[in-house]
Amino acid sequence: MLKKDNNIKFIITADDDIMYPRRWAQGLIQTTKKHGSVSCYRGHNLTYAEGSYNYNQSINQNKFSVEPSFDLLPTGCSGICYLRKSINKLVNDRRFLNFAYDADDIWYKAMTLSAGFKCVRVEPRNIHFPLIITCLSNALYSKNVWQNENDKKLI
């Protein structure tokens, strides 16, 4: 789609098992415009220690702020807004299926880092919008966080 329409300025990602508030997209776009960064309502500052990343440790050591950072990993459950130019052309490379087929947040982070873009929260603290209850059993969250699958993708 990006190849076909040069008028697209922003790409917003969302989960289909979350209920978003009315002005949700507006907050993302305004923050992205203000900082020239990828914006999110929820993200974690990556912790690197002993030669690898620890996603679960990162969750517990968030630096809550609204300052853009290369360390912030946006998590898509509450929505992410990307500037069109922040998405590296490799985002369409199908090799990601070999490394992170079910960890799209990590793949998008790698693509925006390689394009030189920081990430920023819309609000100082993470916001997790309400889940649609019928979707809980198959959520990627269950697999990626509770089964430590995100750690494996970050390595």
Regions found by a protein language model. Give the residues of each.
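Conserved catalytic core of nucleotide-sugar-dependent glycosyltransferases
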Residues: 2-5, 19-96
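Short beta-strand-to-loop acidic/aromatic patch adjacent to the donor-nucleotide binding site
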Residues: 8-19
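Residue-level detector of structured alpha->beta connecting loops
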Residues: 7-9, 36, 116
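A conserved donor-nucleotide-binding helix/loop in the catalytic core
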Residues: 1-9, 107-108
